[in-house]
């Protein structure tokens, strides 16, 4: 997955940001937490930030943040 594929990621943030949020409905990627929360409010009020997947902007891989309970 190329970094160029992210249409809504601005180039000045690309160098600073390591992780982004991916919307579970439309697949758009946001760097800032606040912009992702605003996007989720417009889509569906039942969605929470914890439903979003984190994605590495450098490699394009999904990052698992939640810790597993044993």
UniProtKB/Swiss-Prot annotation:
SMART domains: ZnF_C2H2 (SM00355). One of its GO terms (molecular function) is zinc ion binding. The keyword Ribonucleoprotein does not apply. Disulfide bonds: none annotated. InterPro entries: Znf_C2H2_sf, Znf_C2H2_type. SUPFAM superfamilies: beta-beta-alpha zinc fingers (SSF57667). Keywords: Metal-binding, Zinc, Zinc-finger. A zinc finger (C2H2-type) spans 21-43. Coiled coil: none annotated. This is Uncharacterized zinc finger protein 70.
